Amino acid sequence: MSGSLNKVQLIGRLGADPEIKQMVNGKNVARLSIATSQTWKDKSTGERKEKTEWHRIVIFNEGLVNIVQQYLKKGANVYLEGQLSTRKWRD
């Protein structure tokens, strides 16, 4: 399908230290939990409201995994750019 785009940009905070896991092929992946928030003023009450969304991020690029492992900790501000990929799992 021409003219389509799958691009995501997030600016948020890490909710926990990154998880670094080794895959079966021996390569490492990083798993991140990122919080993004939006605020607005309720029109009827004038009260300030806030909504936080949590995003699960998986990084496969080895160079980026190394940077994540060295520099990112819980609470860090992060900027992420990538593509959405929907996955299913069973508990």
Regions found by a protein language model. Give the residues of each.
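Single-stranded nucleic acid-binding surfaces, predominantly the OB-fold ssDNA-binding core
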Residues: 1-91
